[in-house]
Amino acid sequence: MEPVAMRVVILQQDIAWADPAENVRQAEAAIDRRPGADLYVLPEMFTTGFATHPEGVAEKADSETLRWMVRKAAACRAAVAGSLAVEDGGRYYNRLCFVHPDGRVETYDKRHLFTYSGEHRHYTHGTRRVVVTFRGVRILLQVCYALRFPVWSRNRGDYDVALYVASWPVGRIEAWSALLRARAIENQCYVVGVNRVGRDPVAEYSGA
């Protein structure tokens, strides 16, 4: 493919625990401070924090947060991406939403759930690899723990960028950095990794 210039802004948000309205307010302000990007990427479960018990905090599939993402993408003429705890059809998903400026929404449900925290007991794992095409760039959508499973992200010549959103604790941050580089090297692709910052009731996060 011909070289394509794309400006990506990663938003390493300090997520307010289980407070979607406050987190959307923070995300909107962060985007507004950084105009002119092609793609804005928010962390894993950016409206709630890494909620391993989604009951009571998960949003509906067609939530106000998703409608905000659609409005923001249109206003910025850019794509907006981030994962949400979603209830859909009576099941819970850790769902990465990629919203195009024209309002199209493409989604990827987290395949590799973090068993150490019990995520698999409450969420349903995804079954599909998802590659979106945006402004001529093919982007593989991935969520957090999938970074440790190289076969799932194997580049079959079908993507240019692997995009990971995460809530990756500071205690394992060296692995985060090393694995991002490894996925880039072995797949001969660009990698974008977006990790949150701050604290929640479970862990501390340092972004990069």
Outline where the language-model segments fall.
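Active-site beta-strand/loop signature of hydrolases that rely on acidic residues for catalysis
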Residues: 8-11, 23, 31-57, 73, ...
